[in-house]
Amino acid sequence: MSVLEIKSADQCRHDLVALGEVMLRLDPGEGRVRTARLFSAWEGGGEYNVARGLRRCFGLRTAVVSAFADNEVGRLVEDFILQGGVAVDYLQWRDYDGIGRTVRN
């Protein structure tokens, strides 16, 4: 039987590593999605929100584990994650088939 070893913080690269989906949210502002022609874009997702919040509020070293289509939308979400101060060391990139049958953001 193996023994669980808990390392000290100075021996770890990250204080928290979140595993989950990161989504792109399109916000129409005051109008309705159906009639809007301009949107603000935001990143979000339960696990990612925790990682970003701990980074912003407490300065913890956080990272996210997720997978994205290797296209402009996926790279946009990656940029948002980096702007939030969360490490992207563990992101996985998947080939995009052009229509979202095999992978999508």
Indicate residue ranges for each PLM-predicted region.
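Conserved N-terminal subdomain of the carbohydrate kinase-like
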Residues: R61-N105
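Short pre-catalytic strand/loop immediately N-terminal to key active-site residues, enriched for Gly-Thr
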Residues: T35-G44
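Alpha-helix C-terminal capping segments
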Residues: W42, A51-R61
